[in-house]
């Protein structure tokens, strides 16, 4: 029986530099998105929400999860991708960690997956800076989101015409 070959130092260095990350994939209108699990505090199912008047299109509304009021974003709308008209109850809300009290709306959530940093490809030009990259998993393309940048993009301030006296 032949003995296994020794791996070179460069192979060992490459293996050490390739870190593993857990992602929580979710879907909206036949598009797959994901966030790193260390950005997610919890998931909630079947949550009614209240729409906010004059809110940007990517803001679905507010929802109460575990006694906290969260602003819920539609990632697809924030990225100017096809989305859906949300009914009065959100199928899933991904509760994000942090003081911003944000959540992401989802039609469905999938099981957590583990990927290597080497598997992450640069995002497409259309996703701007709200996407960290794209990963292909089980034959599907998943867009990895940067939750903080997604919020900034969703609520971009646009100059409105002001009344002058």
Predicted regions span which residues?
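An acidic, low-aromatic, low-complexity terminal/linker signal
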Residues: 1-165
């Amino acid at each position: 029986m032949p003995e296994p070959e020794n791996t070179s130092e460069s192979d060992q260095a490459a293996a050490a530099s390739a870190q593993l990350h857990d992602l929580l994939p979710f879907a909206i209108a036949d598009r797959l998105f994901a966030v790193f699990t260390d950005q997610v505090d919890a998931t909630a199912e079947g949550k009614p929400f209240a729409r906010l008047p004059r809110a940007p299109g990517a803001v679905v509304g507010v929802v109460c999860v575990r006694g906290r009021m969260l602003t819920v974003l539609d990632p697809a709308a924030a990225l100017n991708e096809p989305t859906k008209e949300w009914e009065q109850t959100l199928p899933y809300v991904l509760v994000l960690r942090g003081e911003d009290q944000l959540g992401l709306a989802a039609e469905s959530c999938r099981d957590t997956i583990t990927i290597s940093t080497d598997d992450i490809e640069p995002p497409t030009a259309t996703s701007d800076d709200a996407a960290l990259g794209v990963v292909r998993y089980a034959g599907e393309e998943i867009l990895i989101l940067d939750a903080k940048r997604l919020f900034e993009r969703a609520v971009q301030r646009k100059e409105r015409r002001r009344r002058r006296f």
